[in-house]
């Protein structure tokens, strides 16, 4: 072989080696870029999944909060309706023996608390006559005055130092938690 052929063959081998190395380098670069793109898209996908999960949780949380708010509104309305029903029932019972016994019991308890028979008794204008009769029967002295209450009585000593509020409004306010519990039981134990 001639020198010229040896040089050509040598250059051909170098070119073939370069071609092989070039293919390996190109393949390596393509893999590296593909891995980088895959990592980037995987991270973006993970972020999107995370955002979707957070959005789902936010939607569920908002729905739960809204449901609880509506339930609370319904309970409040039920409680108002129950209190109004009590007031209406008292209005129907005025003058009945059971209501007179109720007023008698309130006045007896108030007398024990204030420890005097000389008292000022405040009553609803609708109850004034009944309260005057019950007070006389119990031996209470003093006056019976009208007050803007729905029922029951407010008893105070003449000097005003002790007051016992047994108005229907006060009695209901003191029992409001029991009424809420009763409503809850009635709703969930059916």
Swiss-Prot record:
This protein's major location comes to membrane
Single biological process term from Gene Ontology: proton motive force-driven plasma membrane ATP synthesis
Membrane topology type? Peripheral membrane protein
User: Where located?
Assistant: Cell membrane
Q: Which UniProt keywords apply?
A: ATP synthesis, Cell membrane, Hydrogen ion transport, Ion transport, Membrane, Transport
Report if keyword Transport is assigned. yes
Question: Which branch of life, at top level?
Answer: Archaea
Q: Name one Pfam family in it.
A: vATP-synt_E
Span-the-membrane segments of this chain are none
Q: Name one GO molecular function term.
A: proton-transporting ATPase activity, rotational mechanism
Which family does the UniProt entry place this protein in? Belongs to the V-ATPase E subunit family.
- Subunit structure, per the record? Has multiple subunits with at least A(3), B(3), C, D, E, F, H, I and proteolipid K(x).
Q: Which purpose does this protein serve, as stated in its record?
A: Component of the A-type ATP synthase that produces ATP from ADP in the presence of a proton gradient across the membrane.
User: Which protein are we looking at?
Assistant: A-type ATP synthase subunit E
Q: Which organism is it from?
A: Pyrobaculum neutrophilum (strain DSM 2338 / JCM 9278 / NBRC 100436 / V24Sta) (Thermoproteus neutrophilus)
